[in-house]
Amino acid sequence: MATESALIKVHVKSPSNKYDVEIAADASVSELKDKVLVFVPTANKEQVCIIYTGKILKDEETLTQHKIADGHTVHLVIRNQARPTPAPAAATPTASSAPSSNPTPSSQPNPTNNPFAAMGGMGSPADILNNPDAMRSVMDNPITQQLLGNPEFMRTIIQSNPQFQALIERNPEVGHILNDPNVMRQTMEMIRNPNMFQEMMRNHDQAIRNLQGIPGGEAALERLYNDVQEPLLNSATNSLSGNPFASLRGDQSSEPRVDRAGQENNEALPNPWASNANQATNNQSNNRSADFNSLLDSPGISSLMEQMMSNPSMQASMFSPEVINSIRQNMSNNPGLIDSIVGQIPSARDNPQISEGIRRSFPQMLNMMSDPSVMEAMRNPRVSEAFRQIQEGFSTLRREAPQLLNLFQAGAMGGGAFGSDANASSAGANSANGLADLFNSMNMGGGRPSSTAAPVNPEQTYASQLEQLQSMGFSDRARNVAALTATFGDLNAAVERLLNSP
C-alpha cells in the first residue's frame, strides 16, 4: 500500500460478549473476520457471520462500503457447523427397481380387500421398546430415520410440550442443545445400540456417585435434578401420578457422603431426591414394563402422531416415493424383517391368521400410502377427526374389553363377520376400516386428545432477544418473534434462520 490507512476501533458484539477490534478503515470484511477469530478460536472462518444494520456482510466487501467508522458496532453470529448429508443417488436407482421384485397385491388376494385388516392387532409399542432387536429394526426403518433426521419436525414435537417449554425458558442452554442436530443424531445412535446405552448409563451413574464425594458436589447434583431431570421426566409423563422410573430406584438407603469421600464408586446410583418407592424388588421388572407402557400412553406421544398426520409437508416426506420404494426394497431383500416385527406382536404370535394377514398387508399398505388421493383425504380435517374418534373407540375396547377387540379383528380377517356385504360400498367400507386399523396400530397415545398448554406471549418470554435482534437491524418484529419461537430463544439460531429466510 502506498499510503498508510488510518486505524479505527470497531466494537464487535456477540450474544454473550463484546470485543474491540482495531483495523484499517478500508479493510475488507474478510480481514475483520480474521481479527474476530482471535477472540473465538473454536469457530472457523466459514462459521463467522458479521451483521451491520440488518445485513450480512460479504468477505469481499470493505468497511468503507458500508460506512463503518470509528466507534461503530457490528454484530457477530457464529453459524452452526453444517453436517454433510449422505447423497441418496446410489440408493435411488435400486429403489426404483424394487417394486418389480415384490409381489403385487393381485398376486396374493386378500379375502376382505382390506390391506390393513390385520394391523389392528399389533399391540403396544412397548413390546418393541423392550426388545433390542425390534428396537434396532425400528430405528433402521427409513421412515424413522426420515422423521428423526428432520430438525424442524423434532422442534415442532418438543415445542408442543408445555413442560419442555418451561424447562427451556428456565434453562436456555437446554434449548441450545435441542437445536443441535448432532445431539439428536448421537441420541438416536445410542438408542439403536442398547448395549452402548446400558454402558453409558452405568458409567453415568458411577460418575455421579463419585461426584457426591466432592465438597459441594451433592448440592450441584440436587440443582441438576430439580432444574433439568425432574422437568424432563414430568414432560414425558405428565399424565402419570409419579415418576415412571421410580421402580428402578430400589432401596433408597445410602451411606453418608462423608463416609464415601475419596472412594471410587462401583455401584449404580439411586435417585436421592425423588419420592420414596414402596415397591418390592421382585416386582421391579413388571413395574418397568408397565412404566414404559404408561410413558408411551402419554399425551405428548399422542400429540406426536397427531402432528405427523396434520402436517402436509411431513406427510409428503414420510410417504414420498423414494421412502416407500426404499422400504419396499428392504422388505424384499430381507424377508426376515417382517417376521421379526410380527414376532414381537403378542396377538400375532397366538393367532396365525392375524400373523399371515399382517405379512400380506405390508405391500398393500405401502401402495396405498403412496397414493396421492389417499394422502389428500388424510389431510382433510373432518377425516382426521373421524380417525381420531375411531382411534378412541379402539383404545377403549383395548382397555375395557380386549376380547371384543379380538372378535372385531377376527371378523375383519375372516371375510367380514360384522356386516360383510358383497358389493362396492362394502369394499369401500372395508378400506375405511383398514385405515382405521392402521391408525389403531399407530396408536401410541391411548386415544386421548393431547393436552394443550396455556398460551404464552412470546414477546414477553424473548424480550431480551428481541431487543438484540432489533439492535442488529432486524426491524420486522413478527418475523423476529417467529424465529425465536422456532429456535426456543437461541439467538444465534434465530439470526441464522432470519438470514436464510426469503
Curated annotation (Swiss-Prot):
<feature type="compositionally biased region" description="Basic and acidic residues">
    <location>
        <begin position="252"/>
        <end position="262"/>
    </location>
</feature>
<dbReference type="GO" id="GO:0031593">
    <property type="term" value="F:polyubiquitin modification-dependent protein binding"/>
</dbReference>
<feature type="compositionally biased region" description="Low complexity">
    <location>
        <begin position="84"/>
        <end position="115"/>
    </location>
</feature>
<dbReference type="Pfam" id="PF00627">
    <property type="entry name" value="UBA"/>
</dbReference>
<dbReference type="GO" id="GO:2000042">
    <property type="term" value="P:negative regulation of double-strand break repair via homologous recombination"/>
</dbReference>
<feature type="domain" description="STI1 3">
    <location>
        <begin position="289"/>
        <end position="327"/>
    </location>
</feature>
<keyword id="KW-0677">Repeat</keyword>
<keyword id="KW-0234">DNA repair</keyword>
<dbReference type="InterPro" id="IPR036353">
    <property type="entry name" value="XPC-bd_sf"/>
</dbReference>
<dbReference type="GO" id="GO:0006611">
    <property type="term" value="P:protein export from nucleus"/>
</dbReference>
<feature type="domain" description="UBA">
    <location>
        <begin position="455"/>
        <end position="501"/>
    </location>
</feature>
<dbReference type="GO" id="GO:0043161">
    <property type="term" value="P:proteasome-mediated ubiquitin-dependent protein catabolic process"/>
</dbReference>
<comment type="function">
    <text>May play a role in the ER-associated protein degradation pathway (ERAD) possibly via its interaction with ER-localized proteins ubxn-4 and cdc-48.1 and/or cdc48.2, providing a link between the polyubiquitinated ERAD substrates and the proteasome. Also plays an important role in the regulation of other protein degradation mechanisms and pathways including ubiquitin-proteasome system (UPS) and autophagy.</text>
</comment>
<feature type="compositionally biased region" description="Low complexity">
    <location>
        <begin position="274"/>
        <end position="290"/>
    </location>
</feature>
<dbReference type="GO" id="GO:0006511">
    <property type="term" value="P:ubiquitin-dependent protein catabolic process"/>
</dbReference>
<dbReference type="InterPro" id="IPR009060">
    <property type="entry name" value="UBA-like_sf"/>
</dbReference>
<dbReference type="GO" id="GO:0003684">
    <property type="term" value="F:damaged DNA binding"/>
</dbReference>
<keyword id="KW-0227">DNA damage</keyword>
<dbReference type="InterPro" id="IPR015940">
    <property type="entry name" value="UBA"/>
</dbReference>
<feature type="compositionally biased region" description="Polar residues">
    <location>
        <begin position="235"/>
        <end position="251"/>
    </location>
</feature>
<feature type="region of interest" description="Disordered">
    <location>
        <begin position="235"/>
        <end position="294"/>
    </location>
</feature>
<feature type="domain" description="Ubiquitin-like">
    <location>
        <begin position="8"/>
        <end position="83"/>
    </location>
</feature>
<feature type="region of interest" description="Disordered">
    <location>
        <begin position="84"/>
        <end position="136"/>
    </location>
</feature>
<dbReference type="Pfam" id="PF23195">
    <property type="entry name" value="UBQLN1"/>
</dbReference>
<protein>
    <recommendedName>
        <fullName>Ubiquilin</fullName>
    </recommendedName>
</protein>
<dbReference type="InterPro" id="IPR029071">
    <property type="entry name" value="Ubiquitin-like_domsf"/>
</dbReference>
<feature type="domain" description="STI1 4">
    <location>
        <begin position="351"/>
        <end position="387"/>
    </location>
</feature>
<dbReference type="GO" id="GO:0006289">
    <property type="term" value="P:nucleotide-excision repair"/>
</dbReference>
<dbReference type="InterPro" id="IPR006636">
    <property type="entry name" value="STI1_HS-bd"/>
</dbReference>
<dbReference type="InterPro" id="IPR015496">
    <property type="entry name" value="Ubiquilin"/>
</dbReference>
<feature type="domain" description="STI1 2">
    <location>
        <begin position="161"/>
        <end position="200"/>
    </location>
</feature>
<dbReference type="GO" id="GO:0036503">
    <property type="term" value="P:ERAD pathway"/>
</dbReference>
<dbReference type="GO" id="GO:0005829">
    <property type="term" value="C:cytosol"/>
</dbReference>
<feature type="domain" description="STI1 1">
    <location>
        <begin position="124"/>
        <end position="157"/>
    </location>
</feature>
<dbReference type="InterPro" id="IPR000626">
    <property type="entry name" value="Ubiquitin-like_dom"/>
</dbReference>
<dbReference type="Pfam" id="PF00240">
    <property type="entry name" value="ubiquitin"/>
</dbReference>
